[in-house]
Design a protein with these regions (language model features):
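N-terminal type II signal-anchor transmembrane helix
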Residues: 1-71
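Extracytoplasmic/periplasmic proteins that interact with beta-lactams or build/remodel peptidoglycan
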Residues: 41-42, 59-69, 74, 137-145, ...
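Peptidoglycan glycan-strand catalytic modules in the bacterial/periplasmic cell-wall system
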Residues: 66-271, 327, 388, 474-478, ...
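Acidic helix-start/capping segments at beta-turn-to-alpha-helix junctions
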Residues: 98, 117-133, 144, 276-299, ...
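Bacterial peptidoglycan biogenesis and beta-lactam-recognition machinery
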Residues: 106-119, 132-138, 185-191, 203-208, ...
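Conserved catalytic neighborhood of penicillin-recognizing serine enzymes
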Residues: 132-156, 291-300, 425-493, 553-583
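Active-site loop and adjoining helix of the penicillin-binding protein/serine DD-peptidase-beta-lactamase fold
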Residues: 178, 182, 186, 238-256, ...
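A penicillin-recognizing enzyme superfamily signal
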Residues: 336, 340-362, 370-372, 383-385, ...
Length: 707
């Protein structure tokens, strides 16, 4: 619309406008039949040169797919997050309300369906009006605007700032090129294709492009659902998306909307009654904004940490570009659909179990995280923690499940158990001793004694003497596991842990020290869950997988992910370990039970001063690791503490994490699943209890009572 000004044009402006008027007249006379304004005097020279300049321009514009947001989806197809630099969702013509098309044509180019890309009448009127009142009235058709926006978009996508600027520079050359491109484009595209392309590429806000994204931003519904009043508001934005932004400048937006409504009434698109109702409706009453941030910050608190993990895998994958920068640009412009392994039912249950035990911002200051991996595939099905994702005070972007490094405590003992079984030892062999002091030479690697400092095993009262491996595992007897470690290849325990993915903070094999047998080493819940998933699936360790398939904007597959697994322990040993872990939990984990008596294998872990507590375990369907501690102060004692309103003198892996987090969660997620037992495999001959010596009051055939 023309913005009239009271002042007159200065002489220099007047001459420029006169020259432009005659130059344009000559151009149109050459190009458009029926329009001819003679050129006289020196201006005629300009007019005669126009066709020559025009003929030297490229005849076709390369219309490319514009930047479009990418979607990260869960396993059920729900949107986890959107990624973009420009918020745009490209939609076909039939997904845009007809009244929206009518509104944009009415206000931007009412002769759109009559001209061939350039509107001579509109250009002449604009020149005359500008000449008469010193203002500046545009004369670009929708086709010309589409050309201009397309060139800008191509420059943006190709990182060519000069090309992007060339689309808007105030030169005759640019205008000539735009006109020729528009005329050519009208020969290769239908009016509906041009209009749809324009509505998908035009700006509707500071970073919002295309009518679909605009409709979702301002009204929280699709462009197909736009009504006439909403269409008028959006149609008015394209002239100046920042100045007329209804979220920041509602008064200006309302004035502009009313102008569009007037034109729509004059064109017969709406009635007089509609017009009166429309202009009397405050813009604020129309808006239902959806200003969800892009990226994982826009994901819900439940899914944000998995989002962080999944996008990290995407950005590390060279299938999407040979540099991090290219992969990130593809993510934010390529209109990708990234499908993931996240099971929303499991993830919701994980979050609920965590916050039921330790609420967000609990007075204890404790953090907790849990992750579930599918045995046999490595698919990460759930990843949650009791914190809010973000950069504000009280929030964190640190992913404790994937990136947290916390001492694992007795959970590490499972690798001693595996090495014990790998070397052919029986589950019923006697392990442990009363003397808890181990001196130099009692541990060996490759058959050769190794040097270690004298080590005095600390243990809870009542854990002296000998046990079999089932009871030693269930009761988590430190001295028994140190004894087992002294009777196998000591270094291979740590090599085996590394094979399962459990290393030190630098990715190196954990140092072969007696203290590390008991869990001084650190790891993440994801790594521990994945290691136990390998035990649950015949010793097959799979790479943790967050992505399943990535497709481009046309749904062509860029990459489909398949399980990447390798054998790290023999199936026999894995089954034996599963059997022992199942027997030990069934016998000794009285606080941790699954509904219906469903069998599971697990190992708890508690570090010095109860600073970190764990329960990591599995069924044939799911492997889950849960951790409790303080992420920012992982050595700080967790004793004499109130958690969720309840006092604890100390907490432990089995009685706190297992009872309050792991078991409730695993019971919930197994509802409706098949009841599958753990492997029934030979783990050694059950020793015959020695017959006690008969006494006068005890028959010789009385059996010895078990524990």
């Amino acid at each position: 619309m023309s913005k009239s000004r009271s002042r007159n044009a200065r002489p220099a402006q007047l001459m420029t406008l006169i020259g432009s008027f005659f130059a344009l007249s000559g151009l149109l006379g050459t190009l458009v039949a029926g329009i001819m304004i003679p050129a006289v005097g020196s201006v005629g020279v300009v007019a005669k040169t126009v066709p020559t300049v025009f003929d030297g321009l490229p005849s076709e514009i390369q219309v490319i797919a514009p930047a479009e947001e990418s979607l990260l989806l869960d396993a059920d197809g729900g949107v986890i997050a959107r990624f973009y630099d420009k918020r745009r969702i490209v939609v076909p013509s039939d997904k845009i309300a007809d009244v929206m098309k009518q509104a944009i044509v009415a206000i931007e180019d009412k002769r759109f369906y009559d001209h061939h890309g350039v509107d001579p009448e509109g250009m002449a009127r604009a020149l005359v009006n500008n000449l008469s009142d010193g203002g500046k009235q545009g004369a670009s058709t929708i086709t010309q605007q589409f050309v201009r926006n397309s060139i800008q978009e191509r420059g943006y996508l190709e990182g060519d700032a000069e090309l992007a600027y060339s689309a808007v520079e105030q030169t005759t050359q640019r205008k000539l090129r735009e006109v020729k491109y528009a005329l050519t484009l009208e020969k290769s595209m239908t009016k509906d294709e041009i209009l749809t392309g324009y509505l998908n590429i035009a700006p509707f806000g500071p970073i919002t492009y295309g009518v679909e994204a605009a409709s979702q931003l301002y009204f929280s519904h699709s462009a197909a659902e736009l009504n006439w009043l909403e269409s008028a508001l959006l149609a008015g934005l394209v002239q100046s998306p920042v100045d007329y932004n209804p979220l920041t400048n509602p008064e200006a937006a309302e004035t502009r909307r009313n102008t569009v409504l007037m034109v729509m009434r004059n064109e017969g698109i709406i009635t007089e009654e509609d017009y009166q109702n429309g202009v009397n409706t405050p813009v604020a009453d129309m808006l239902k904004p959806n200003e969800t941030p892009q990226g994982c910050l826009g994901a819900s608190g439940i899914n944000a940490y998995f989002c962080d993990f999944a996008i990290s895998q995407f950005l590390d994958d060279p299938a999407f570009g040979d540099s991090y920068a290219k992969r990130e640009r593809l993510l934010k412009t390529g209109g990708l659909t990234i499908r993931t392994t996240l099971n929303p039912r499991l993830n919701n249950a994980a979050y609920q179990a965590l916050v039921d035990a330790i609420p967000v911002h609990d007075e204890s200051g404790l953090d907790t995280a849990m992750v579930t991996v599918e045995p046999g595939t490595g698919k990460v099905l759930a990843m949650a923690q009791n914190t809010e994702y973000g950069v504000e005070d009280g929030r964190t972007m640190s992913n404790y499940s994937a990136n947290g490094i916390f001492q694992v405590g007795s959970t590490f003992k499972v690798f001693t158990l595996l090495q014990w079984l790998k070397e052919g030892n029986s589950a019923y062999a006697s392990v442990g001793r009363n003397n808890r002091i181990y001196v130099n030479g009692e541990f060996s690697c490759g058959g050769e004694p190794i040097y270690t400092d004298t080590y005095d095993v600390e243990d809870l009262p009542g854990k002296n003497g000998t046990f079999n491996t089932i009871s030693a595992t269930g009761l988590s007897v430190n001295q028994a596991f140190i004894n087992m470690a002294s009777r196998v290849d000591f270094c291979q325990i740590f090599q085996l842990a590394s094979d399962f993915g459990v290393t030190d903070a630098n990715g190196e094999i954990v140092q072969a020290l007696p203290a590390n047998i008991l869990g001084s080493a650190s790891s993440s819940p994801l790594t521990m869950a994945n290691a136990f998933a390998a035990i649950a699936h015949d010793g097959q360790l799979c790479t943790p997988q967050a992505l399943t398939v990535v497709t481009d904007r046309s749904e062509a597959v860029i990459k489909e992910y398949t399980p990447q697994c390798k054998e790290v322990i023999s199936p026999t040993v894995a089954r034996q370990a599963s059997n022992i872990l199942g027997k030990s939990t069934a016998r000794y984990y009285n606080a941790t039970r699954l509904d219906g008596g469903r069998p599971f294998g697990a190992k708890s872990g508690t570090t010095n001063n109860n600073a970190n507590t764990w329960l990591t375990g599995f069924t044939p369907q799911y492997a889950t690791s849960a951790w409790v501690g303080r992420a920012a102060a992982s050595q700080q004692p967790v004793q004499d503490i109130v958690i969720n309103g309840n006092y604890y003198d100390a907490i432990y892996g089995e009685t706190f994490v297992g009872r309050n987090i792991w078991a409730p969660y695993m019971s919930t997620v197994h509802e409706g699943l098949d009841f599958i037992g753990l492997p029934d495999v030979f783990i050694g001959n059950v020793p015959t209890p020695p017959r006690p010596a008969p006494t006068p009051n005890q028959p010789s055939n009385t059996p010895q009572s078990g524990r």
